[in-house]
Amino acid sequence: MKTDLILNIETSTSNCSVSLSKGKNLIDLIEIDNSSYSHSENLHTFIYQILNSNKFSSEDLGCVSVSRGPGSYTGLRIGVSAAKGLCFANDIPLVSVSSLEILANSSNFNGIIIPTIDARRDEVYSSAFFQSNMISKEKPEIIVSESFIEYLKNNNIIIVGNGQFKCEKIIKK
């Protein structure tokens, strides 16, 4: 790796975000949450802005990290295509990260974290993590009142992500 400067791209949901990090330290973040999923209009502009405003170019990157889903198929294609183009042009590695893992690691909760991504209708993509370790498989799931029953007994849990309200309504029944 040329440097430890990482460009992170997330386009799996209605949120389009680009961030720069050095090692584990976040340098900058640009994001927009737009229900019209206008990632193709924003992503390349965000990449240019974040690099330019921090006095970097794509040649300074050590790698690019991109969300691999689950999530919006079109959003994922846009993010992965941009990431692959940058990596190919600069001969740097591409790292893919689970969208659910990104959500789980954004919380400092001491207990079981259930990241969710709305999959439309009555479905969400979900998984379960304990202290950054996945304890259940990523899967699309039709939410029913028993969906997370194995985690609700004697555990502190938090449900995060844009599918959380759908889960909360059904689980409380």
Where are these regions (language model features)?
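Short, basic/glycine-rich phosphate-binding loops at helix/coil junctions
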Residues: 25-27, 80-86, 123-130
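Residue-level signal for well-ordered, solvent-exposed loop/turn and beta-edge residues enriched
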Residues: 25, 72, 133-134
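Phosphate-handling active-site elements
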Residues: 53-59, 88-99
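Short amphipathic alpha-helical face segments that pack within enzyme cores
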Residues: 42-45, 81, 85, 102
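Surface "functional belts" at beta-alpha junctions
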Residues: 2, 35, 93-173
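DPxDG-like acidic metal-binding loop motif
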Residues: 63-94
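N-terminal beta-alpha supersecondary unit
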Residues: 1-68
